[in-house]
Amino acid sequence: MEMSAAMFARVSFYPTLLYNVLMEKASARNWYDRIDEHVILGALPFRSQANDLIEKENMKAVVSMNEDYELTAFSNNTEKWRKLGIEFLQLATTDIFESPNQEKLFRGVEFINKFLPLKQRIGGLSSSYQPENVGSVYVHCKAGRTRSATLVGCYLMMKNGWTPDQAVDHMRKCRPHILLHTKQWDALRLFYTNNVETKS
């Protein structure tokens, strides 16, 4: 099943990416949306969008939930982002059938935390503070709907002490077309139990 799921994700990548481009042009969907003052949730950032994101959105870092093959043709890899002065974290997760595992979700939240102002930092996370790094983090997968939304939901829960329902409701207000399936909901609930509920 894992092999066939990974193969299906690969085969469907370009057609579904084209669908996302068309939906952004033909509907009210945005390529990306700001979730709070520090986190942007979006689709695959094309190389042509990089400078705009840096200049207009004060983007300092990128978290990609994509696998390597999804980044090759249109988006920057670690080296290309670093040349632009952007920190990059890749938490590769297979599209459609998988949710990011708990270790990846925690690493992602910890990474985002590095770019928050000191007074807004999530307590208990081991991330160094450098004032020059304060800015926005662009969190993405292919469409900015499922894998990346799962990570952003975890960030919102830890930052605000929210439940999974509260985090998802907030994301839907900002980005109505997010799409979470049972596996993503299960991941959010487990993350909440392990990292939020036990600390409140």
UniProtKB/Swiss-Prot annotation:
Residues forming the catalytic site: 141 (phosphocysteine intermediate)
Membrane topology note: Peripheral membrane protein
SMART domains named in the record: DSPc
Domain Tyrosine-protein phosphatase: 31-197
Subcellular location: Mitochondrion inner membrane
CDD domains xref list: PTPMT1
EC class: hydrolase
Tissue: Highly enriched in testis.
Keywords of this entry: Hydrolase, Lipid biosynthesis, Lipid metabolism, Membrane, Mitochondrion, Mitochondrion inner membrane, Phospholipid biosynthesis, Phospholipid metabolism, Protein phosphatase, Transit peptide
Entry's family note: Belongs to the protein-tyrosine phosphatase family. Non-receptor class dual specificity subfamily.
Physiological role: Lipid phosphatase that may mediate dephosphorylation of mitochondrial proteins. Protein phosphatase that may mediate dephosphorylation of mitochondrial proteins. Does not dephosphorylate Akt.
Name this protein carries in UniProt: Phosphatidylglycerophosphatase and protein-tyrosine phosphatase 1
